[in-house]
Amino acid sequence: MTLKAVFFGSIGSFSETSRLQLDSFNESMKINQIDEIWDEKEYIGYLKISGGINRLKSILSKQMDENILQKIHYDKTKIFQQKILKSRSLIRPGFEQLCEELLANNVLLGIASTTSLQTIENILLGLKSIKISDFNFIAHSGTVNKQKPDPQVYKICLEELNVQEIESVAFEDTTSSLNSVISAGIKGIAIPGNLSLNQDFSMAQIKLNEFSDIDFKGLKELL
C-alpha cells in the first residue's frame, strides 16, 4: 500500500503547549472573576476531554451560563496566542525532520486540528527547515462544527487531499483525539505530550515518545 498522506492532529501532536494552555485557562478564569484555579494534576485529567470549550463546559457548565463559558474560552485563546508568540519555538523535536523526509517522498501533509487557525499559524511560526505552505491542508475551528472525538475533521481532511483512509496515517497526543482518528478509519499513532503520557493508548497502531522514533519506511509499514 502506498502512503499518500500523513496527518498531524491536535496542536499537541506537533508542539508542546499543555502547560502554556493550563496557565492561560487559569489567567482567563481570574480575569472573568471565576474562583477556580486548576493545578497540573487536575489538568492532566482534563486533557482527556478534547477541545478547550468542551473542557470548560464539562468542568464548569453546572455553575456557568453559556455566554460566560464562551467568554472564558475567548479570553483564554487570546492569552494563549500571546504566550505562544513570546515563547521560543514550541515545535516538538524531530517533527520537521520527519516532515522533510515525507515531503521528499511526495507524501501529502495535513493538520487535522479543531483549534483556531490563528493559534495554529502562531505555533508554526516556530518552524525552521520547513514552511507553513508545505502543509497541503490545515483544518481548524472554522473548518468543522463538531469537536473530537467525532471523526468529522479527519473525514474533511481525507476529502480535501483526495486520499483514502487506508492510504494515510495520523498522529495524536491524547486518547480522545486518537479516537477521532480510529473512528475515521485511519491508522492512528500515539505521540503523547508531557501531560498526557499516562493516558491509555492501547487503540493506537504504535505509541512513540518522539518523532525521531519513526521514519517514512516505518510509517509505510503501518498500513
Predicted regions and their residues:
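Residues at secondary-structure transition points
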Residues: 47, 67, 86, 90-93, ...
